[in-house]
Regions:
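Short, hydrophobic alpha-helical packing/hinge segments within bilobed ligand-binding/sensory domains
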Residues: 1, 23, 87-91, 97, ...
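A ligand-binding cleft/hinge motif common to bilobed small-molecule-binding domains
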Residues: 6-18, 66-70, 97-133
Length: 162
């Protein structure tokens, strides 16, 4: 039995938790971003800059939806296959791909993890934006005992980051 599931989940109308679970209050607002090489920052700033470029996204994710809606019409190729984040970063740094679409927190983590010999970031975020429906991350909480969701929501209110 799992009491709390946390995996960057957003409440969608068609994402049902069943009778014994509820969504928590939101704990984080995600902005969409593209992770790119630092050397490309001056030329890759907005959707039209990605014409002819390759953007990798996780299949069926918010990044995939965003890629199809925001960058594909501008002429970008959207590739929805992620063998691993390490492999995607390797492809990005070697120039095999041009960007990795993710939420800002995930891409910020990757950018901070890959530094040059001077401690400077090799990767940076660009085109940070919210989707039409704001992405509010929530926890899936077992609700057999109503005290658990109440306690979690109380904690989230005290530590609000939105």
């Amino acid at each position: 039995v799992c009491d709390v599931a946390a995996a960057g989940m957003m409440e969608y109308e068609n994402r049902r938790l069943g009778n014994d679970a509820v969504w928590s209050a939101p704990y984080m607002l995600v902005k969409r971003s593209l992770l790119i090489r630092r050397t490309d920052l001056e030329t890759l700033k907005e959707p039209q800059d990605f014409q002819g470029k390759t953007i990798v996204v996780t299949p069926t994710s918010s990044a995939h939806i965003d890629g199809d809606l925001r960058y594909k019409p501008a002429g970008a190729t959207i590739v929805s296959f992620v063998p691993s984040q390490d492999e995607i970063v390797s492809q990005l740094l070697s120039g095999l791909i041009d960007a990795f679409g993710e939420g800002d927190a995930s891409n910020e983590y990757l950018a901070g993890k890959h530094l040059d010999e001077h401690g400077e970031r090799l990767l940076v975020l660009t085109d940070l934006h919210s989707m039409e429906t704001p992405e509010l991350l929530r926890l899936a909480v077992r609700s057999v005992d109503a005290r658990l969701p109440a306690a979690i929501n109380e904690f989230l209110e005290r530590t609000q980051r939105i």
